């Protein structure tokens, strides 16, 4: 099926919504199963454990609030909960993406072929296995780019006042951008676009990608819905690639 997508770019919210529609397309569902299973097992177990620990973690987090901000505690409490969910959700979604990276790449490749009518390389299961070292190297590049920035933001959480007010907002913006990079990278990587070139391309449509990443980040925090977010985000990012980036960066047509 050739896509009815136009070359005119839409908002990041649009592409996120498209992800939910595309994930259930006939012929695509079988490529969704493995990423979905990885996400359900890892994110489901991780968030179940998290919710058993919140009554310990949140009071500890709130103990860093200085006395002069105690009058804002009724506002800072939900911010503390959101902060824990953001950091925890992003950490475990990163692990899930590492494990499912080869299958996410295959999903992006097959969906792109369906949307455009193009013929992808005939990889098959053996081609995927052969490509695993390169895919893992790509995931490592993302991790190395992300880690020092994440550490700086996490340090802010331990600064009284800033850690309970400014840091959660900065972390949300950072995780939105990083999740846009994470999921948009799959269709870019199927065309062997270098990591640095991919980041440069995303910056040309930064608002669109921040919108997409922000919704992905929010849904990663929501129990049950976050179990399905990985394949949905891959599909949405692939739709964005087809509309916004494919003409310039595609290796196969």
From Swiss-Prot:
Belongs to the CysZ family. GO terms for molecular function: high-affinity sulfate:proton symporter activity. It is a multi-pass membrane protein. It comes from Shigella flexneri. One of its GO terms (cellular component) is plasma membrane. It is found in: Cell inner membrane. Keywords: Amino-acid biosynthesis, Cell inner membrane, Cell membrane, Cysteine biosynthesis, Membrane, Sulfate transport, Transmembrane, Transmembrane helix, Transport. The gene is cysZ. GO terms for biological process: cysteine biosynthetic process; sulfate assimilation. This is Sulfate transporter CysZ. The keyword Transferase does not apply. The chain crosses the membrane at residues 31-51, 75-95, 151-171, 222-242. Coiled coil: none annotated. High affinity, high specificity proton-dependent sulfate transporter, which mediates sulfate uptake. Provides the sulfur source for the cysteine synthesis pathway. Its main location: membrane. NCBIfam families: PRK04949.1 (NF003433).
């Amino acid at each position: 099926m050739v896509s009815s997508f136009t070359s005119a770019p839409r908002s990041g919210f649009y592409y996120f919504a498209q992800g939910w529609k595309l994930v259930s397309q006939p012929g695509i569902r079988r490529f969704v199963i493995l990423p979905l299973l990885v996400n359900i097992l890892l994110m489901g177990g991780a968030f179940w454990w998290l919710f058993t620990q919140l009554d310990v973690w949140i009071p500890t987090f709130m103990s860093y609030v200085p006395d002069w901000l105690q009058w804002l505690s009724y506002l800072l409490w939900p911010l503390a909960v959101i902060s824990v969910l953001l950091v925890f959700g992003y950490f475990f979604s990163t692990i899930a993406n590492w494990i499912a990276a080869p299958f996410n790449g295959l999903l992006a490749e097959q969906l792109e072929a369906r949307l455009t009518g193009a013929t992808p390389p005939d990889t098959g299961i053996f081609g995927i296995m052969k490509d695993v070292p390169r895919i893992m190297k790509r995931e490592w590049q993302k991790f190395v780019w992300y880690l020092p920035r994440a550490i700086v933001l996490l340090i802010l959480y331990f600064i009284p006042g800033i850690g309970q007010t400014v840091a959660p907002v900065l972390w949300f913006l950072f995780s939105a951008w990083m999740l846009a990079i994470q999921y948009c990278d799959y269709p870019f990587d199927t065309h062997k676009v270098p990591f640095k070139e991919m980041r440069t391309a995303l910056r040309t449509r930064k608002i669109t990608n921040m919108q997409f990443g922000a919704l992905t980040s929010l849904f990663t925090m929501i129990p049950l819905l976050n179990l399905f977010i990985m394949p949905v985000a891959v599909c949405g990012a692939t739709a964005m690639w087809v509309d916004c980036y494919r003409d310039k960066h595609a290796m196969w047509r």
